[in-house]
């Protein structure tokens, strides 16, 4: 029996449909009388241990315990997936061999492999790489099963990412949260290997905008008349001339006006202007590449305002409908063995009236081989394209329709000719000044024809460059019109979801070490195609950023956390290098263990920075009357109370009164000499549920006792002799009380008699 394990139920059902007649069972589908069985995970059904599950002492956040580095990494089954895990485990026992049908990327590889490792599987495992779920693609993939061992590097890469994220997140989040609480802040400070430098991009962009000072500068535009037509030009500055700033902008309007007067005067006196340079080059622009997930997310964000997460979710739905290929692809190229599908896909487009695809598909040439067809650029998956399954546009949602059309048109562009144009540069000399004009003449529209009916985007207006008349060097022209143009520099734009995702992908532009930037240019950025959208959504959910209209703006909390982190955390240099290392683990260049050893060394350095950071005290919090540090609101077993942030050196506490510490109650407190649990003093407290006695060490001991006539009732449990009796009201009978063991030893409850336990 072959056992297929898919990433999630919808994908499992899609695979099963292509294997034969199936019968649905609990957590699986049997095909061909049990010869094949398809089961599935629910995404990751295993999760990392929390620190407190490695060691009880880690349940408390203590700086001296850091770093926490597991000697042996452990996973546990998620509670909600326990039943499905058991089903998978039992099915593996019956299987002759297993087929890993996880998504064709490093996370999909790990997702299935970690389950097989957890159950101790010894059966042979094959790997199926499904880039699409239509019948033809599934049948082809079934005929090309690989040995799962060939993908150990891919699995280890995902495992390295997971464990590195745990080390950074668990340790640095604890360290900075402890420091922030010492300063009087109450929220958890999350630190993420990718999340934090991504947040820093937003914070730094906001700071650039706030500190931006506009600069007014001037340019001189002159239109010249040639016998064959007009030539628009811009004045070329001389590098050593007066009035230029460090970026070669002319800041003096007087100089600009003087230049214009100089040209006009020369023209009025009959001084000729002459063409001194004519450069003409025939240029070609190859077909645009099909989309990867990130390039689609950027385009859909720009054009339709869709968030990266919306794009990912929508493309996932189209994939599961078998209409488009695997969505989480970082590739923009196509394998040559899929060229045979082109005629079918183009024929299907002949039925799509939207965006004129039917019209354009009629003129497409499936014999054209664009630069996108390149096997050398293909790894586990290829660019996003339509499958051979015909689409009924009427059945698609608005978002599905928009994204399908974007993907389809980019695919269609591969079967149109190259775009050809002639670029012309003209330089005109007059009165010892030079003016340059650039023109463009379209020779063959080619693939750009299918984008012509779109509204031109302001960032893609090459075709709108002027068409210059036929000219030659030495031709004389005359001055027609001149204008001094005032220009004002503008601040950088705030990020949108789409442009932030693009920045994550092009992270080499944002590293601090500019020498490193060049080497990272080929790096795939920080995060992955599958995770970037979730990281941006995570920043919103953590309230580190908010959205104003479509733009991302950092919150006060977002600014604060970036301000306290060292550059090693907030700049993407280190994270980008880690991503490059993960790629090297995937291709077998470096082993997992050496990567993790390196991460621990980096972590120790980052923890040293965290321990030495000086955070500004939260001035909004009350001050401890005994040591001068801030008081923090805490949750105790009997309700909220205020404790000194200097604990354990200072053990000052106070009850909460309408959100503030009530220090006046101390004058009314009654004390006894000794807490029977720890030996410290007991004090009487009047809480909202009545009067009781509590150990003064509310964080360390927190023993409590009932009050009877202004004295604590200290009675050992007669059942175990260890715990102490506590008083509680019966849930079944209002006004009736009973006593139970504080250690919950299981002894029968004792009924209350006049405020005391009714003991024999």
Predicted regions and their residues:
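Intrinsically disordered, low-complexity regulatory segments
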Residues: 1-170, 491
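OB-fold/S1-family RNA-binding modules
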Residues: 51, 94-99, 139, 232-251, ...
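C-terminal or mid-to-C-terminal helical accessory/interaction module adjacent to the motor/catalytic core
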Residues: 137-222
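C-terminal helical "lid" subdomain and adjoining coupling/linker elements of P-loop NTPases
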Residues: 184, 203-251, 303
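Metal- or metallocofactor-binding catalytic centers and their adjacent structured scaffolds
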Residues: 244-289
